[in-house]
């Protein structure tokens, strides 16, 4: 898929090829700036079906990303994430369903829409004979707009040497070129597919800070990542897909509250016995280990469990809401 990845970076991520090189300016054309200003969300997908022969990669998938948010898009390899993203970029046409990106069907107005979409894939393929700076120049020329000051700031933050040729870059440095181009471009929507692949922990932190900044500036981010902690830090909402279908969607805080809470109670063994009996009478699975009781509690039973702990004067009580990893594994550990 490296050829397709390069096509996506050139045609979308940085940067739509309109058929002729245009001078880089400080702002996109007025027609582009007006995209996505209506009431419709920047990304609005309903009943999306995509088939490859007899294989149904996407099966009536729904996805909605609110303006100005960072939205996590999760699923293991083969779940349909990359196929969905390629439909959003106009590289694939859907077989069924409706898809709107910034108010338009991406395969019908690809050149116009892609000027407002920055895309970063997980495996960036660039022109090996060019320097990093020349790649950024080329991408800015194809887009027709550029913020040179912001670009320079990002190169410094990501510790990117633009004078070196792409063929000498590590995977992480190639990733940095795409991130600098995407974040510096005056676009309203960023589609990031495993964007921190190849980055070290320090650069991952810089990435997190820059995405938060982009969101603070009113830009919309669709983030697909296998690093669940990264998604949990950045995203206000998530969509989890499995076998081409959505299995979980919504505000991350709400999803965590609606999931089981992990509760631990600590006390002497003779004090825990009556509490354990009361908890098991509620139908809860209780694990006792080293003077502590551990259990996962549905949201509607959390007040009852805490009340029982109070009645039995258990003072060592810890509650831990479900993490994003818990939500994810709940669906993918099912047979």
Question: Across the structure, where does each feature detected by a protein language model lie?
Answer:
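C-terminal coupling/interaction segments
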Residues: 2-14, 18-19, 23, 299-335
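Extreme N-terminus of proteins, especially the signal/transit-peptide cleavage junction
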Residues: 26-42
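ABC transporter nucleotide-binding domains
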Residues: 40-242, 247-248
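Short acidic active-site motifs
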Residues: 109, 251, 304
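Short loop/turn segments at beta->alpha junctions
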Residues: 131, 251, 271, 298-301, ...
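ABC transporter nucleotide-binding domain
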Residues: 207-296
